[in-house]
Amino acid sequence: MIDKRNKKAVTHISTCLCHSSIPIYGDSPFLNTHRAAMDPRPLVLLLLLASHISTFRQMYFEGETIHFPMGIYGNETTLYMNDIILEGTRANTTTRTISLTTTKKNAGTNLYTVISETGHNATYLITVQPLGQSIHHAYTWAGNTFTLQGQVFEHGNYTRWVRLENAEPKLIISWALSNRTINKGPAYTANMDFDPGNNTLTLHPVLITDAGIFQCVIDQQTNLTLTINFTVSENPPIVAHLDIHKTISRTIAICSCLLIAVIAVLCCLRQLNVNGRGNSEMI
C-alpha cells in the first residue's frame, strides 16, 4: 500500500516525465519523427523519381536504337531518303576521316578509280541515272583502291552513292553533274559528312549553282579529279527534327523528375514541421 507521501512523489515524477523531453512511448518526438519518415507519400514519390530517372536514362542517354522513316527533301546537297527506313545506334567512339579521290582516266572511257588515303573495307553501290534510267554498278573496296565501271556523265544526270551493309542500302546522296567542257581546269573539291551509325551522308559543295545544285565540271579533254573528304563518326547526331523532339522530351523528363523530387522533399519537411509543432505544444 502506497502512503500519501509516496503517492505524491510518484505523481510528481510522472508529471515531470510527461512534460519533459525524455522519450515516452506515444508522445516521443523521436517516434513521431520516425513515423513522419515512414510516411508512404514521400517514399512513393522517391520511388517514382527513381523510376523516371532509370527510364529516361535508358531512353536518352544510353545506347538506344532509333527507328525512323525519313522524309527529307531539298536541293542536291540534301539526302533523299524518303523511301528508306534507317536505323542508328549511338556509340561513343572516335571520329576518323577518309579522303577519296575519284579520277576520270581519259576522254572516251568510263573507268573511274577511287582511292582512300586511310583505307576502309566496305561494299559500295553507285547508281548512275542517265536521262531517267537507272544503272547499278557494284564494287568492293579492297585495301585502298577500287574500280568502278561507269559511263560518261551527261547534263542532268545524278550520281547516287549508296553504302551497303549486309546487302541493305544504308544511305543515299545525290548531286548533279554538268556536261560543260573545258580544255583544262582545277580539281573541284567537296566535303561530305558521313555517319555510318546514323546512316547519313551530307555533301558540302564548293561550287554551287543558283538552284543549290553541286555542278561537277566534266573535262572531256583532260582528266578530272573530284576529291571528296568526309568524316566517319560513330557517335552520330540525330536528324534536326528528331533533335528537337528528343530535346523537348528530355526537358519534360528532367522537369518532371525535379518536380517529383521537390514534392517529396516538401512532403517530408511538412510532416517534420507538423510533428515538431506538435511536440513543442506538448512541452
Swiss-Prot record:
Protein's name in the database: Putative Ig-like domain-containing protein ORF10
Entry annotated with the keyword Glycoprotein: yes
Top-level taxonomy: Viruses, Varidnaviria, Bamfordvirae, Preplasmiviricota, Tectiliviricetes
Segment forming the signal sequence: 1-55
Gene3D superfamilies listed in its UniProt record: Immunoglobulins
Keywords: Glycoprotein, Immunoglobulin domain, Signal
Domain Ig-like: 129-227
The keyword Magnesium appears for this protein: no
Glycosylation site positions: N75, N92, N121, N157, N179, N198, N223, N229
Protein source organism: Fowl adenovirus A serotype 1 (strain CELO / Phelps) (FAdV-1)
Coiled coil regions, renumbered to chain: none
Domain of life: Viruses
